[in-house]
């Protein structure tokens, strides 16, 4: 029998499980306050659904051996979008849903072997609302949810925002393969890759300008307006940041607009964002989301119903980030019911039921103790604070 978990999998101890539950419950309370209903998408889906119309690469999905192509979900948005367009099709829009559960991501380890990463996720999806109203609610909800996490200044939280329309504007002068190479270089902030393309000097300098055009949102928008003129995407972002700025300031969250920012999964067709915090070792992404209208359309939605936005929190990463700030519940007083040679286990179990009826946590010492002192010495090992001694 293998004594180690599979590569990428983790055994969580009781405290880690409790902290995950506490974080999930905090977020769930916020979702409910905002009128979101809980759903539970399946862990196993058809590969066609999980790939989200090509937005998620096959190598990111853990495949199952089955009669039909199946896999474990690498995220929950595609499954919830499918449900919204089928089982929940007749429900009125806006359709507000939230879910929490485990996701599974496949990656290649340094030595070349397959590694499966298992993570707990919690998030919301909002269907049937066009820009920019949906984004206004979504990011306002994000800030409300983040507030319950009680991030501190040492985490240096930063909300990085992009928009696929901004990348489209940058890519307008370029065609075909060159367009994709430039896009990849910009996304990865790879100046050397841009140089290797041997572009005309004016185009190269303009791309370098875009590469460095990131920072305070309103300043960046002003620079982009000077380059591209009046654009609906810029107007929407202007309105959105005017709404977000005071919310972010209240929580000490830095806002950053980056026209070249694009996430790993190519789900998004509009606003994209991720919330980054500084851990003791390195930056960590604790939330991400955006607009994914194309995905909803692929699920069969038409017209206004083909609209969706959402975000998700990475619970395990948040737990590790907040280990010093958030603690497990104060130790619950636990009674150890112990018995001596003159009593029996049956008596102890009956006594335990007495405590349980009063709502008191109690455990039974399953072997008889020599005397009261022997029973008392076992309190610490059993995680108990009081002793109920039976000797007759």
Swiss-Prot record:
Keywords: Amino-acid biosynthesis, Cytoplasm, Histidine biosynthesis
Pathway(s) where this gene product acts: Amino-acid biosynthesis; L-histidine biosynthesis; L-histidine from 5-phospho-alpha-D-ribose 1-diphosphate: step 1/9
Entry GO terms, CC: cytoplasm
Record InterPro entries: aa-tRNA-synth_II, aa-tRNA-synth_II/BPL/LPL, HisRS-like_core, HisRS/HisZ, HisZ
Coiled-coil regions listed: none
A Pfam family assignment: tRNA-synt_His
Localisation per UniProt entry: Cytoplasm
GO biological process, one term: L-histidine biosynthetic process
Top-level taxonomic group: Bacteria
Major site of localization recorded for this protein: cytoplasm
Single GO molecular function: histidine-tRNA ligase activity
Remaining remarks: This function is generally fulfilled by the C-terminal part of HisG, which is missing in some bacteria such as this one.
Biological role stated in the UniProt entry: Required for the first step of histidine biosynthesis. May allow the feedback regulation of ATP phosphoribosyltransferase activity by histidine.
Subunit details: Heteromultimer composed of HisG and HisZ subunits.
Family: Belongs to the class-II aminoacyl-tRNA synthetase family. HisZ subfamily.
Name of this protein: ATP phosphoribosyltransferase regulatory subunit
């Amino acid at each position: 029998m293998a004594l180690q978990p599979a590569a990428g999998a983790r055994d969580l101890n009781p405290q880690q499980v409790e902290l995950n539950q506490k974080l999930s419950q905090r977020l769930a309370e916020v979702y409910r306050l905002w009128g979101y209903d809980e759903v539970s998408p399946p862990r196993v889906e058809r590969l066609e659904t999980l790939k989200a119309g090509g937005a998620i690469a096959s190598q990111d999905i853990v495949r199952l051996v089955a009669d039909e192509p199946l896999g474990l979900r690498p995220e929950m948005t595609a499954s919830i979008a499918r449900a919204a367009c089928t089982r929940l099709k007749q429900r009125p829009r806006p359709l507000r849903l939230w879910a929490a559960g485990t996701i599974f991501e496949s990656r290649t380890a340094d030595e070349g072997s397959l590694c499966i990463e298992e993570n707990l996720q919690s998030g919301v999806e909002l269907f049937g609302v066009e820009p920019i109203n949906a984004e206004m609610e979504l990011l306002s909800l994000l800030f409300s949810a983040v507030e319950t996490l009680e991030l501190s200044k040492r985490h240096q939280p930063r909300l990085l925002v992009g928009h696929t329309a901004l990348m489209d504007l940058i890519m307008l002068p370029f065609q075909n393969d060159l367009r994709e190479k430039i896009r990849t270089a910009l996304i990865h902030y790879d100046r050397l890759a841009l140089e290797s393309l041997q572009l005309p000097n004016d185009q190269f300098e303009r791309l370098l300008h875009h590469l460095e055009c990131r920072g305070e949102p309103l300043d960046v928008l002003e620079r982009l307006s000077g380059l591209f003129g009046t654009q609906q995407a810029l107007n929407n972002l202007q309105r959105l940041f005017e709404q977000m700025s005071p919310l972010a300031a209240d929580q000490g969250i830095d806002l950053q607009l980056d026209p070249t920012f694009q996430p790993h999964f190519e789900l998004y067709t509009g606003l994209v964002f991720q919330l980054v915090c500084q851990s003791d070792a390195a930056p960590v992404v604790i939330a991400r989301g955006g607009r994914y209208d194309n995905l909803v359309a692929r699920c069969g939605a038409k017209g206004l119903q083909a609209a969706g936005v959402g975000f998700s929190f990475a619970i395990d990463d948040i737990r590790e980030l907040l280990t010093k700030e958030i603690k497990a519940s104060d130790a619950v007083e636990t009674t150890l019911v112990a018995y001596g040679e003159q009593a029996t286990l049956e008596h102890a179990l009956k006594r335990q039921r007495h405590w349980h009826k009063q709502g008191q946590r109690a455990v039974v010492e399953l072997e008889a103790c020599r005397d009261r002192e022997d029973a008392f010495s076992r309190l610490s090992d059993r995680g108990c604070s009081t002793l109920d001694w039976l000797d007759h």
